[in-house]
Amino acid sequence: MSNITIGVIGYGYWGPNIVRNFFNAPNCTVKAVADGRPERLAVLAKVFPSINGVKTGDEIINDKEIDAVVVATPVYTHFALAKKALENGKHVLIEKP
């Protein structure tokens, strides 16, 4: 099985759990996590120093090395982020609901 490179948008309530699970999953590499709050990216850097913290979801969506995007942001942002990721050829997982 080949490796899949993942980017996560949102490191608030569910983001840390999603990152942890994909980080520990075989054949997965979490390359980047996007969050607009610097304090959340600081926590990410302490817990997962090998993962790049970025400020916007667009940085993840436009990254040619990322195969799949997890959208773990407030519900009202899901459609726009998922649509943009799909239009850029990414696989998408949207955190419920």
Language-model features, listed with the residues they occupy:
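Beta-loop-alpha module in the N-terminal Rossmann-like domain of NAD(P)-dependent dehydrogenases
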Residues: 48-97
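N-terminal Rossmann-like dinucleotide-binding module
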Residues: 1-48
